[in-house]
Every structure is written in C-alpha cells, then in structure tokens.
Amino acid sequence: HHAYVHGVKKLLLLGSSCIYPRDSPQPMKEEYLLTGPLEPTNEWYAVAKIAGIKMCQAYRRQYGCDFIAAMPTNLYGPNDNFDLQTAHVLAALLRLFHEAREQGTPPTLWGTGAPRREFLHVDDCADACLFLMDRYSDAMIMNVGAGQDIAIAELAALVAEVVGYRGDMQWD
C-alpha cells in the first residue's frame, strides 16, 4: 500500500515457484496458479506469496499502478545456504556429497530422485528482473527461469561428479 501512497512508478514483487500446485506438470506455466493444492510443507509461505501477487493485480486494476510479479525458479549462487536443515536442493546436494567424499560414507538423499526441478543462477535472475522492470508491464505473473528442468537423481549424479564423490548413494 505504501508503494501506491508514495507514488512508486513501478514495483516488482518476487515470488517463488512454490506458489504452484504440488502436482503441477513440468515445466510449470503461469496459468497453473491456483489450479490445485499446494505443497503442505510450505503452504503458508506460498499463500503469502500468492497474496502479494493478488495485491499487485488489485492495485493495478483499481489504481492503475504498474505493479508486476515475477516467479523465479530454484536459485543458486554466491552466499547460498548450505545448512542441511534449511538449504534448498542444490546447496544441500553439494554439502551432502562433499561430506560423503570427506567421510567416506554414502549420502542419504531424500525422496526418490524422480521429481524434476529447474535451476537458475542468481545473476541471471537479477538480469531478468532488470529486463522485466524495463520492458514488462502486465497483470499476468511472469516465470523467470532457463526453461529446462532436470530430475533430482540426474542432478545428484552431476553434483557427485563435480564434487569428486565416486561411491554409492542411498535414497530414503
């Protein structure tokens, strides 16, 4: 509301791909928003992001504000979080395989490895945000990503190779 009150000319809300239904087809498309149940483990975070999107759309409709919303895919890059309790998938895999190599024990990976995810470097996300601020003005949310996804099992194999881990991996 304060952006409107203070006459902000353009506002970009960054959301998250968690706004899409848990069982969304891959790759996720903007029109999948609100078409099914959210992932229960981050449902309230997703609801807060969706509320922000809807607020941008409401201010655009009611007051003509140039408020837009972008949904970056899974990001990675400098200053990533490698804490296994809170890290996102790529940083967590890097940490797991590094520790497995150092300790000589196979890592236990979560799930089956079948889900697919898309990844984007933070610098590419920043470039996309600047592009959107300069050239995009629409109520429809805009996904920001590379347009290519990878199975978690494939990603795990790539990370193991990069880290130099040559042992087995276990899926729970």
Report residues per predicted region:
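C-terminal substrate-binding subdomain of Rossmann-fold SDR/epimerase-dehydratase oxidoreductases
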Residues: 93, 99-172
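Hydrophobic pocket-lining residues that define ligand/cofactor binding sites across diverse proteins
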Residues: 3, 60, 97, 132-133
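Conserved active-site helix of classical SDR/Rossmann-fold NAD(P)-dependent CH-OH oxidoreductases
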Residues: 50-57, 61, 90-95, 126-127, ...
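Amphipathic alpha-helical dimer-interface segment in Rossmann-like NAD(P)H-dependent oxidoreductases
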Residues: 1-8, 94
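Rossmann-fold scaffold of SDR-type NAD(P)-dependent oxidoreductases
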Residues: 13-14, 143
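Hydrophobic/aromatic residues located in beta-strands of well-ordered beta-sheets
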Residues: 10-11, 67, 107, 169
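Glycine-rich "substrate-gating" loop/helix at the edge of Rossmann-like oxidoreductase active sites
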Residues: 42-45, 73-88, 111-123, 146-148
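Catalytic helix-loop patch of NAD(P)-dependent Rossmann-fold dehydrogenases
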Residues: 5, 9-10, 18-69, 74-76, ...
